[in-house]
């Protein structure tokens, strides 16, 4: 039987507050919204880190980075960033992964021999994940391969822009090889920098969203349809065995986004009936948000629920999917120019038509602090706060934002 909220709120494709938000920020914005709904005092920091402070209980705070809970270990997410380590761990636990090997940019002959052996198409990825959740490029012939490798080796200056703060991996620096500069002034990655070549695996692509060991969502990605999104699959528990095996192989990570390839999506799937093509600690909830905003928010609430040992949340969790209104006093800290910050925020606020109310309070130019109040739905407040903290639409960013 459907829950009452499912009957009252018909399912539709998402066209709400986050429709034009960068996909890299969606996980963190949904987590912030879930925290706002239970009225925890918050602190928003650079790299989309949000800390919720608990008034009582065995722990005093909970933290999330890009939506990844603090209960995930640094070692666990670093293993995921190093695709060689991740592949080895999965294979050690009996999981199928695409045939593949890593090469440096100076190993041109070895790469040609290897691809000649496994055949096209192949998938090219960084050996160390540079951006959150990047999935690689499929190439079908030698000409495409040369073009992709040439493009991949160029150091992308956007990696060092303010906007890259919410795209780049924020957990650990996994490679510090010096770059080289061509006669034309183009900066290239070191010739010893490594990339991964994997055999492309045909079949039905399925994405599993796993929270604390349970598959909470399964999505399929149609191929050759012109549609770039995902479709929800019924009965995600069919993939539970696969998720459990991957979690066993990659300890220390509480949330996982697992991409697999299967022959069909109709029946139960075991670890021997699929190929693991990608794993990320990021859930990529933007892929869930557009087919089902309700489910995406439910998943974010379940992540918070698993992190927070707090009786107040237990009393409210059944209502966590409704768009509730909040009034939140806020304090922006670490501002170099308070007047410029206010000007930028007012300009950004004027472009919003979401019913959000912004009220400026006291400011302290000496301390670099400004107080303001936000009134509106939790999704609108979360969107606005994350925009200010991450520099999305606002060029002047505070060092932190306290939410009371």
PLM features per residue range, with description:
Residues 104, 128, 199-201, 262-264, ...:
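Short, flexible loop/turn elements at secondary-structure junctions
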Residues 122, 216-217, 275-278:
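Protein kinase-like catalytic core scaffold
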Residues 3-119, 129-132, 376-404:
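Conserved N-proximal alpha/beta basic substrate-recognition cap immediately N-terminal to
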């Amino acid at each position: 039987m459907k829950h009452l909220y499912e009957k009252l709120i018909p399912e539709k494709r998402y066209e709400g507050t986050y429709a034009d938000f960068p996909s890299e920020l969606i996980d963190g914005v949904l987590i912030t919204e879930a925290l706002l709904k239970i009225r925890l005092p918050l602190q928003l920091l650079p790299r989309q880190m949000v800390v919720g402070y608990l008034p009582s209980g065995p722990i005093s705070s909970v933290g999330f980075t890009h939506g990844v809970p603090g209960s995930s270990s640094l070692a666990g997410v670093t293993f995921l960033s190093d695709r060689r380590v991740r592949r080895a761990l999965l294979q050690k636990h009996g999981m199928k992964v695409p045939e593949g090997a890593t090469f440096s940019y100076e190993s041109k002959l070895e790469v040609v021999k290897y691809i000649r052996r496994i055949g096209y198409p192949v998938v090219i990825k960084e050996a160390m994940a540079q951006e959150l959740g990047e999935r690689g490029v499929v190439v079908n012939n030698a000409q495409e391969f040369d073009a992709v490798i040439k493009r991949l080796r160029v150091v992308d200056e956007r990696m060092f822009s303010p906007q890259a703060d919410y795209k780049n991996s924020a957990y650990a620096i996994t490679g510090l090889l010096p770059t080289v500069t061509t006669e034309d002034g183009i900066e290239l990655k070191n010739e010893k920098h490594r990339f991964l070549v994997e055999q492309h695996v045909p079949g039905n692509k399925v994405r599993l969203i796993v929270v604390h060991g349970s598959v909470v969502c399964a999505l399929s990605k149609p191929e050759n349809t012109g549609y770039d999104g995902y479709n929800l699959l019924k009965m995600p528990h069919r993939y539970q065995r696969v998720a459990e095996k991957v979690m066993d192989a990659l300890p220390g990570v509480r949330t996982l986004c697992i991409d697999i390839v299967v022959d069909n999506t109709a029946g139960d799937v075991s670890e021997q009936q699929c190929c693991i093509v990608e794993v990320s600690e990021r859930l990529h909830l933007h892929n869930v948000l557009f087919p089902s905003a309700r489910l995406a928010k439910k998943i974010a609430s379940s992540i918070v629920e698993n992190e927070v040992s707090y009786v107040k949340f237990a009393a409210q969790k059944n209502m966590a999917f409704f768009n509730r209104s909040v009034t939140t006093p806020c304090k922006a800290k670490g501002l170099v120019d308070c007047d410029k910050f206010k000007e930028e925020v007012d300009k950004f606020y004027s472009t919003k038509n979401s019913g959000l109310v912004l009220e400026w309070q006291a400011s302290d130019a000496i301390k670099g602090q400004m107080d303001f109040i936000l009134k509106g739905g939790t999704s609108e407040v979360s969107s606005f706060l994350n925009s200010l903290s991450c520099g999305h639409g606002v060029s002047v960013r505070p060092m932190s934002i306290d939410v009371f």
